[in-house]
Structures are given as structure tokens and as C-alpha cells.
């Protein structure tokens, strides 16, 4: 499936960015878009529930982001765990098939989009630049805390009984399946502690995973991940992993991103990916979003040039961002000169 899977793992992202003109656009928030289209995701599976009940809505959201200018679309598998599906009454085999299906749906959306480009049957502001533009599919892996659905994905505190081996055993089969699903890369997202990053890195090595990955951490203060580990120390785990082709930050307030990019740029030459939240804060205990006093969607987009100048190469949105956000990011980047003449990282 993946048109870039055959390339050398270490060069996939730098080659892809070159084809995109130096910068690439990642998609945006998924769950809130599913809700906007009528999905009921009040469930421990969250957006992954729609892989069972409403796969057509998953396709719709992917298409919305592709038509907004995204170069990378992320599967609806963030909360899709074998353990979570089994808890809902599915068999292990059915759960594994849903993981594969999350990737298939994304590829189907990409093909629909490409066909629309060819036929000219769609209305998109950047049509002249969009036809057969490079598009990667990233298979999402959420944290152990996302499966627990108890707010611990936002605290990184899993308890003393959860060791690195516990986390490796939990994630192993899901990573194996997604690595063989045809996805172009695996996106390990919203990593809330160093221990889980180490577990992911070990799994990629132990299972001889042969597709690239990115590690994206979350931060509440612009310095540390939720568990309290330094973001830089966590990122060093990713930087030392040969499969990791980009390192970044997601599910974080926009106001912290610039300083985090500078910190990451000082310790890695790998491309940096940033896809922050809209600026609202999630209350994991009460399961609701709290509106930010100081940031709007316009403020979010106004940061993009600053993030680019600080050293980031891939830009998107996480929770509560929309296709409009991504369209605005794509517009900012398309208005900039090509990055081809700028220093290339990871070489």
C-alpha cells in the first residue's frame, strides 16, 4: 500500500519533506470532527469506536483533512487497542482486524482524494498544487493511559505496578500488526512519560520493526512531560532509536511549542513535528474541555511561521483543531518560499 515503505527508514522523512518543498502539513483533531459529523464517541474507545460503528465517518474526516491540505493523515487507532476491543466483547481476531482496517480506511480516503484531484470534481483553494501531492499514512499508537481512559494519559502516572515490561507486553501485538498493515510509518503519540518512550524504543528494536516511526511527546508546562520527566531527556530516547525519523510535540498548548522546538533542535538533527491542541485544556477527571482565556484559532495559526523559523518541519493540529485550522496552516506554508535551500536535518 504505502508508496514510501520501500525507502530506507532513515531517509524516509527527509526525502518526503524534500518532495513537499521542505515543510509538510499534518492533519488535525479527529474526535471532535467525528462528533461534528454526528458520531457518538462517549465510550472508553473514544474515536476508535467509529471503526466499529461508523467507518464512513472516519473516511469523511480523513477526506476533510486531505481537502484542507494535509500531507500526513493519521489513522483512527489512537485508542484502538486489542485489550480495549476485547473488553467490548470482540474476539482477539476481530480486534486485530479492526487495527488493520484503520489503516485500510485511511488509504481508501487517500485514493478517493487523488481521484477527485484527477477528475477536478472538488473545490479546493490550492488545487493547482494538490494533484498527486505526496501524502503519507501514519498509524497512530496511543499511550497505555489512553486505553485506561482514566485521565492517566494526561498525567503519565500509571502506578508502581506498571513496569517497562508491562508496557511492552501491552503494546507489542498492536505495534506488530500496524507495522505490517501497509502504513508508511507509526506515530507514537501523546507520550506522557519517559518509561513509555523507552518501552516503544525497545519494541521497535526487539520486534525488528522495519517501518519508520515518530515519537511525539506532550507537555503541560513547556519543559516536562506530564509525569515530570524532562522533554529533552525523553526525546533523547527517540533520537537514539534508529527507526525514529521525526521527533515532536503534540497535545500541548500552542504557547509552549516555540520553546520546546528550540530545546529539541539543540539535541537532535531529526525533523521536528509539532501538532498542538487548539489552546483549550482537557480536564481528564471530569472529561471535558476548558476554554483557554488567551488563545484563538487565529493565534494558533499565527505561530506557524515562528515555529518554522525555530526549526520545525511538520505542522498540524491535535485536540479541538479543525480542517479550517489545517487549511490555514497549509496556506501559511504555501505562501512561504521553498525550504529547499535551507539546512536539511537528519543527514
From Swiss-Prot:
Cofactors demanded by this protein: Zn(2+)
Annotated keywords: Amino-acid biosynthesis, Metal-binding, Methionine biosynthesis, Methyltransferase, S-adenosyl-L-methionine, Transferase, Zinc
Molecular function GO labels: S-methylmethionine-homocysteine S-methyltransferase activity; zinc ion binding
Catalytic reaction(s) noted: S-methyl-L-methionine + L-homocysteine = 2 L-methionine + H(+)
Short name of any one Pfam family annotated for the protein: S-methyl_trans
Tissue expression notes: Expressed predominantly in rosette leaves. Expressed in roots, cauline leaves and developing seeds.
Keyword Methyltransferase tagged: yes
Family annotation (InterPro entries): Betaine-hCys_S-MeTrfase_BHMT (IPR017226), HCY_dom (IPR003726), HCY_dom_sf (IPR036589), Hcy_S-methyltransferase (IPR051486)
A single GO BP: methylation
Domain Hcy-binding: 12-333
Membrane-spanning intervals of the chain: none
PROSITE patterns, per the entry: HCY
Free-text function comment from the UniProt entry: Catalyzes methyl transfer from S-methylmethionine (SMM) to adenosyl-L-homocysteine (AdoMet). SMM degradation (by HMT-1, HMT-2 and HMT-3) and biosynthesis (by MMT1) constitute the SMM cycle in plants, which is probably required to achieve short term control of AdoMet level.
Annotated protein name in UniProt: Homocysteine S-methyltransferase 3
Amino acid at each position: 500500500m504505502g508508496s514510501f515503505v520501500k525507502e530506507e527508514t532513515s531517509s524516509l522523512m527527509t526525502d518526503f519533506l524534500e518532495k513537499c518543498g521542505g515543510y509538510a502539513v499534518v492533519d488535525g483533531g479527529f474526535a471532535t470532527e467525528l462528533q461534528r459529523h454526528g458520531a457518538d464517541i462517549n465510550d472508553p474507545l473514544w474515536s476508535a469506536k467509529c471503526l466499529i460503528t461508523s467507518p464512513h465517518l472516519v473516511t469523511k474526516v480523513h477526506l476533510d483533512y486531505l481537502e484542507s491540505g494535509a500531507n500526513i493523515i493519521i489513522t483512527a487507532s489512537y485508542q484502538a487497542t486489542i485489550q480495549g476491543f476485547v473488553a467490548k466483547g470482540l474476539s482477539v481476531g476481530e480486534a486485530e482486524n479492526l487495527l488493520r482496517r484503520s489503516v485500510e480506511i485511511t488509504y481508501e480516503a487517500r485514493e478517493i482524494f487523488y481521484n477527485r484531484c484527477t477528475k477536478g470534481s472538488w473545490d479546493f483553494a490550492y488545487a493547482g498544487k494538490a494533484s498527486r501531492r505526496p501524502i503519507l499514512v501514519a498509524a497512530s499508537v496511543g499511550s497505555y493511559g489512553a486505553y485506561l481512559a482514566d485521565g492517566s494519559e494526561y498525567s503519565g502516572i500509571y502506578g508502581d505496578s506498571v513496569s517497562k515490561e508491562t508496557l511492552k507486553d501491552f503494546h507489542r501485538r498492536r505495534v506488530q500488526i500496524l507495522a505490517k498493515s501497509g502504513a508508511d510509518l507509526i506515530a507514537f503519540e501523546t507520550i506522557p512519560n519517559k518509561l513509555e518512550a523507552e518501552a516503544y524504543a525497545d519494541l521497535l528494536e526487539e520486534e525488528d520493526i522495519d517501518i519508520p516511526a515518530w515519537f511525539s511527546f506532550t507537555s503541560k508546562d513547556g519543559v516536562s512531560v506530564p509525569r515530570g520527566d524532562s522533554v529533552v531527556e525523553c526525546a533523547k530516547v527517540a533520537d537514539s532509536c534508529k527507526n525514529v525519523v521525526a521527533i515532536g510535540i503534540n497535545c500541548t498548548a500552542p504557547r509552549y511549542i516555540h520553546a520546546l522546538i528550540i530545546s529539541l533542535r539543540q539535541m537532535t538533527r531529526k525533523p521536528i513535528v509539532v501538532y498542538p491542541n487548539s489552546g483549550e485544556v482537557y480536564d481528564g477527571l471530569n472529561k471535558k474541555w476548558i476554554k483557554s482565556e488567551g488563545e484563538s484559532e487565529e493565534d494558533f495559526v499565527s505561530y506557524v511561521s515562528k515555529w518554522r523559523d525555530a526549526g520545525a518541519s511538520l505542522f498540524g493540529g491535535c485536540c479541538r483543531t479543525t480542517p479550517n485550522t489545517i487549511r490555514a496552516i497549509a496556506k501559511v506554508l504555501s505562501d512561504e518560499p521553498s525550504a529547499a535551500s535551507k539546512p536539511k536535518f537528519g543527514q
